[in-house]
Amino acid sequence: FTPMMRSHGADTPREIYQFGKKGEPVYDAIEKMIRLRYSLLPYIYSTSWEVTHRQSTFMRALVMDFPRDKKVWNMNDEYMFGKAFLVAPVLEAQYTPEKVVKVDEESGWNRDNAGKADERVHVDFMQQKSAEVYLPAGTAWYDFWTNEKMEGGRTVTRATTLDIIPLYIKAGSIVPLGPDVQYATEKPWDNLTLRVYPGADGSFVLYEDEFDNYNYEKGAYTEIPMAWDDSSRRLTLGARKGEYKGMLQSRKFTVLLPDGRQKAVSYNGKKVSVKF
């Protein structure tokens, strides 16, 4: 949950297969997060455009969105990822002891300082842990993993495992999710899922371009405005603005609510709405 995701290791291998194999907890946890990251590309790409074009901010201190809640004024262990996600990273090791390893900018890791374990230690990574999370006041929140809805202005205890961090969605959010891919442009975004979180009015602008060049600087891009009216329970997809070579002329969206209800919407660039 950062603007860019890179798994670097100066001279320490970081490939996923260095951490076990499929079916083992560490490997599976890494794979789960990589797949989640790729599914969020429509949200991430659109939010990046907000940063570029409208001077928005990606990783947002809570005070930026909830200035009236004094409890978040000096909070430094939670943040908003875009305007929909509240991220509460687990900042202390929950399964294995931490070890500080010195690094030298010339020679890399000090391997003698790193040391090695005296013996193999079995770690139960599936043992459930927990973390406390403050949900800002003034809005309702949804647990991203379970879709449980809860009111803001209180601290909750969230169960955590190796593959789950506390992650909440602000009521009124519209979150587009993309296909399961191995690389960013493997599949077209012709059937995105739009997760809508009721409880407040909300909006989102889906941004798209050719994805692999600078033609957007010449105006080659599109925006699709989306708006959720909470009182009427209606999602409206506005008329598409702009164009670029190879853009999808028609497509489908699957609109999904936290309670599991969903509806398919055909979209050809003209305003259309769906009611729940």
Language model segments and positions:
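Solvent-exposed, conformationally flexible loop/turn segments
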Residues: 126-128, 153, 267-276
